A protein has these predicted regions:
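Nucleotide/phosphate-binding catalytic cleft detector across ATP-hydrolyzing
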Residues: 1-95, 112-124
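A short acidic Gly-Thr/Ser loop motif
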Residues: 95-103, 108-110, 124-126
Length: 128
């Protein structure tokens, strides 16, 4: 939800080499921020993330990208999209994401039929 986050997204877009234009982006939130205590999407956090990412950025020497749409996903889940698409809804995949500042674990049903369990430790990560 920070200025640095917005600038990092626009920097990545500029470095991609595509011409500045309207774009749709997909971003993530740690499981502990994406889900509430009842394991339901925390719409306040999701909407806050969307609003942050959609803030305009101006460049001194050039045209900027315009974020047209933002989709917010729980961290780690997108890593399993391909495998989950090939599984039946009766199978499940355990996805473990050891990130810079969090450890996210999710048990997801095949075909993305549901997320049956999530765990996040916001104190475990690989950043020093």
């Amino acid at each position: 939800y920070s200025d640095v986050n917005v600038i990092a997204i626009h920097h990545a877009l500029v470095k991609s080499g595509i011409t500045p234009q309207e774009v749709d982006v997909v971003v993530t939130l740690p499981l502990s921020e994406y889900f509430d205590t009842n394991a339901q999407p925390d719409m306040a956090n999701i909407n806050r993330k969307k609003a942050n990412v959609m803030r305009p950025v101006e460049y001194q020497n050039g045209e900027a990208f315009t974020i047209r749409n933002v989709r917010v996903m729980p961290e780690s889940i997108p890593a399993g999209f391909k495998a989950l698409a090939d599984m039946s809804p009766f199978e499940s995949l355990l996805i473990v994401d050891l990130g810079g500042t969090t450890l996210d674990v999710a048990k997801v049903q095949g075909q993305l039929a549901g997320i049956s369990q999530v765990f996040c430790d916001p104190h475990v990560g690989v950043s020093l």
